[in-house]
């Protein structure tokens, strides 16, 4: 007998049924929430009250506990408690409970946000409120629905294209037109005007196949170029007879029986990418002597490693396509006339290790002229529109052509990329690195507390504009998009939120959108390689490294002296800001006597040689000195100024390996974790935050260890346990070291990254062409939002003065 289908009950019905079954118990629980008064409760607070009340008899309340465990927050406005329920990544429901009347009601996103706003303004805002909703524009676009599909957008698109766009002969015409549209600076590629129909294309491909089977496989394309032109085929199919034949076979197979894997492979072989612009305006962007400066860290390293790998892949593919074209990559950043001893005042700078990649610097300016000094990434918003116009002129001058791909980095770079891509009609790729909304909890609802210092109203608006305008989004991890079972992803946090007094976002982004792709970076393996590769070790740096770590001298480069130089080293290196939580690591270490017995602490952060201009860094400096005094850490800690020499930093990781130490990354949230990748690539056992990217990079207990910086006592115990185990059994250190290396080789290399980026550009370029993925309606909506809201907000950010 067939199983009986039963109706899925709504969240309100399930909660109502639980109230009916256990009214007294649930009144007691919700009364506890209400008694805490008006405010917001986080998930752990909700569960703590539940555990305290029902610890002895949980099974009876299991259905309700499941609902509560899926709750991410509660808004308490007595006698009401509203819950934001997240049954799985990317899926949200909202309910409200009246504790006095035992009434349960479901809320729309808009109703929930309006209720939440009462935390700030104390009353329901009955006036008309601007609501931002991108959902109607995406209703006709294909999207997956399973959580496991999040971040695999290109695979989904390939399946969709294969099934829908090639369902009959007529639907193949966009592919024909796409191939005919290919040219570079007026030079035709792939197909010429001799081919006017699909039948003509197939006929030419068959004749070309017949010819290629009759010549040696290594015959260069130049020997049959003219023959192919007569058939309607131009350069771009390959450099040798074998490679051209392979490409022809891919297309013939697609025309016969479309297949997602073949489609991706074919689109990856088509010449589409010769000129690339990469935008990263803020901070000090240079190749040396800048790491550790304000707003200057992992993003700079990421981009420099990215362009080296990308140029190599572009050169390889152009050669394999049989083309004689010189690619060009431009990294666009801000020119700083007051360059603070760096090359940031230089307009053009060749990227070392490349042939065709330059850093081009364009200054910020306003009606008063060029801004000479560094300004915080939080203060750049009034300059970006003029900056975009200046950048557009500069890149056209340098490239003598429109770019084929524009990649934005971080909020400011992504906004400039959006404006440029919109103006030039170019494919856009977005890389967030970090979305500040996640790093600063409740910075949306309590915007007034943050906005004067951080200007988040501008930044969150810019982020929404960029993520909805872009053609595809690259993230380093799944967590960046949609979090985990228990934590909300960075992009996911932009699905629905409110900025009281400005606007409500009722549908800001869809994490199931096929524009999302996980493409993880690696470390530069010429700099970061295992400590066991002794023939490559840079031992010439060892005297300098020993001076840094162990000398008895205190100066502007290193503070405090280690007493016992034989202990293993707990090592950490990061910017000195609140989220990186370096002071939290020092406090964790200071509180645990056993940890101090087992290991020394060496941190690299900030600059003792000059006073920081960054507000947050100034506060962290004061806190660090205070903690060192409070826990009497002199003799146990070495605090080193930020180190600018990447090559020496690579050897520094390996030197820590020699002490049988460990790298600790204690951030409250880390979008990816380049230092985690670097340390693991050097073979240094790595213990990192469970919040963000490191939770995916490290397999806990196999390729490293996870710690929760919000529970510092437990985190310290994990470190103690690690060093105790290593002391009892030295092979345990080797086991974690090798596990980390294995993980890197499988998933985190720049070669894998650049191959994927090239393929994504091909697939999304094709998708954009054949399905009119200009998202014209969306972009008109974005134009209005930019003109009426963003520009107004940016004009309110105070201009900086030299």
UniProtKB/Swiss-Prot annotation:
**What EC class is this?**
transferase
Keyword field contains Glycosyltransferase: yes
Region ranges (GT-B glycosyltransferase)? 272-749
What terms describe the molecular function in GO for this protein?
sucrose synthase activity
UniProt keyword annotations, A-Z: Glycosyltransferase, Transferase
**What biological processes does GO assign it?**
response to anoxia; sucrose metabolic process
Q: Which reaction is catalysed here?
A: an NDP-alpha-D-glucose + D-fructose = a ribonucleoside 5'-diphosphate + sucrose + H(+)
What InterPro entries does UniProt report for this protein, alphabetically? Answer: Glyco_trans_1 (IPR001296), Sucrose_synth_GT-B1 (IPR000368), Sucrose_synthase_pln/cyn (IPR012820), SUS_EPBD (IPR056736), SUS_N (IPR056735)
Q: Which Pfam families match?
A: Glycos_transf_1, GT-B_Sucrose_synth, SUS_EPBD, SUS_N
Domain of life, per UniProt, equals: Eukaryota
The family line of this record is: Belongs to the glycosyltransferase 1 family. Plant sucrose synthase subfamily.
Summarizing the function annotation, the protein's role is:
Sucrose-cleaving enzyme that provides UDP-glucose and fructose for various metabolic pathways. Most active in the sink tissues where it is responsible for the breakdown of the arriving sucrose.
Query: What is this protein's name?
Result: Sucrose synthase 1
Q: Which organism encodes this protein?
A: Zea mays
Encoding gene, per UniProt annotation: SH-1
């Amino acid at each position: 007998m067939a199983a009986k289908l039963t109706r899925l009950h709504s969240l309100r019905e399930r909660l109502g049924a639980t109230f009916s079954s256990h009214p007294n118990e649930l009144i007691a629980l919700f009364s506890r929430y209400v008694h805490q008064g008006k405010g917001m409760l986080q998930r752990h607070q909700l569960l703590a009250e539940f555990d305290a009340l029902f610890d002895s008899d949980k099974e009876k309340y299991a259905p309700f506990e499941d609902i509560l465990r899926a709750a991410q927050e509660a808004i308490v406005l007595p006698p009401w408690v509203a819950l934001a329920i997240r049954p799985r990544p990317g899926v949200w429901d909202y309910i409200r409970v009246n504790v006095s009347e035992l009434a349960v009601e479901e809320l729309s996103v808009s109703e929930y946000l309006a209720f939440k706003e009462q935390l700030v303004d104390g009353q329901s805002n009955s006036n008309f409120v601007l609501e931002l909703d991108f959902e109607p524009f995406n209703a006709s676009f294909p999207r997956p629905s399973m959580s496991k599909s999040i971040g695999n957008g290109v695979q989904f698109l390939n399946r969709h294209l294969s099934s829908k766009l090639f369902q009959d002969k007529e639907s193949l015409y966009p592919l024909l037109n796409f191939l005919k549209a290919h040219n570079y600076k007026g030079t035709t590629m792939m197909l010429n005007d001799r081919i006017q129909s699909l039948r003509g294309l197939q006929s030419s491909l068959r004749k070309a196949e017949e010819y290629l089977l009759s010549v040696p496989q290594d015959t260069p394309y130049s020997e049959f170029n003219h023959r192919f032109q007569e058939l309607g085929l131009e350069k771009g199919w390959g450099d040798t007879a074998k490679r051209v034949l392979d490409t022809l076979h891919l297309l013939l197979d697609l025309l016969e029986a479309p297949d997602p894997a073949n489609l991706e492979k074919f689109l990856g072989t088509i010449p589409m990418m010769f000129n690339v612009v990469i935008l990263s305006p803020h901070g000090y962007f240079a190749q040396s002597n800048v790491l550790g400066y304000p707003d200057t860290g992992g993003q700079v390293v990421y981009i420099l490693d990215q362009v080296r790998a990308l140029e190599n892949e572009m050169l390889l593919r152009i050669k394999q396509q049989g083309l004689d074209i010189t690619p060009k990559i431009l990294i666009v950043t801000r020119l700083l006339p007051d360059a603070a001893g760096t090359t940031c005042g230089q307009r053009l700078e060749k990227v070392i290790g490349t042939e065709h990649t330059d850093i081009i610097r364009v200054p910020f300016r306003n009606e008063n002229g060029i801004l000479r000094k560094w300004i915080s990434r939080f203060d750049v918003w009034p300059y970006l529109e003029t900056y975009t116009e200046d950048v557009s002129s500069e890149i056209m001058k340098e490239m003598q052509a429109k770019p084929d791909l524009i990649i934005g980095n971080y909020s400011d770079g992504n906004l400039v990329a959006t404006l440029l891509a919109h103006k030039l009609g170019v494919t856009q790729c977005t890389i967030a690195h970090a979305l500040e909304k996640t790093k600063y909890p409740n910075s949306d609802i309590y915007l007034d507390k943050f906005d004067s210092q951080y200007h988040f109203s501008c930044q969150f608006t810019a982020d929404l504009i960029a993520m909805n305008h872009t053609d595809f989004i690259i993230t380093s991890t799944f967590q960046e998009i949609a979090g985990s079972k228990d934590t909300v992803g960075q992009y996911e946090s932009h699905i629905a939120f409110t900025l009281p007094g400005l606007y409500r976002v009722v549908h800001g982004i869809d994490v199931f959108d096929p524009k999302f792709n996980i493409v993880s970076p690696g470390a530069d393996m010429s700099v970061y390689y295992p400590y066991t590769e002794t023939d490559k070790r840079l031992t010439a740096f060892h005297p300098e490294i020993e001076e840094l770590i162990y000398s008895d001298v205190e100066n502007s480069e290193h503070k405090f002296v280690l007493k016992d130089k034989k202990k293993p080293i707990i090592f950490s290196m990061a910017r000195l800001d609140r989220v990186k939580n370096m002071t939290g690591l020092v406090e964790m270490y200071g509180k645990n006597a056993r940890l101090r017995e087992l290991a020394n602490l060496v941190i690299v952060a900030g600059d003792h040689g000059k006073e920081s201009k960054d507000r947050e860094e100034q506060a962290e400096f004061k806190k660090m000195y205070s903690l060192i005094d409070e826990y009497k850490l002199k003799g146990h800690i070495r605090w080193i100024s930020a180190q600018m020499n990447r090559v020496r930093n690579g050897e520094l990781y390996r030197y820590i390996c020699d002490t049988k130490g460990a790298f600790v990354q204690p951030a409250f949230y880390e979008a990816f974790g380049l230092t985690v990748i670097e340390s693991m690539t050097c073979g240094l056992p790595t213990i990192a935050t469970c919040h963000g990217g490191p939770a995916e990079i490290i397999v806990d207990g196999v390729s490293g260890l996870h710690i929760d910086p919000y529970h510092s006592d437990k985190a310290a115990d994990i470190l103690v346990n690690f060093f105790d185990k290593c002391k009892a059994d030295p092979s345990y250190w080797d086991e974690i070291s090798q596990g980390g290396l294995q993980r890197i080789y499988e998933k985190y290399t720049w070669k894998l990254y650049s191959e994927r980026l090239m393929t994504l550009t091909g697939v999304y370029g094709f998708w954009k062409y054949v399905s009119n993925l200009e998202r014209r309606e969306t972009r008109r909506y974005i134009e209005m939002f930019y003109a009426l809201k963003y520009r107004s907000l940016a004009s309110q950010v105070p201009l900086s003065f030299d």
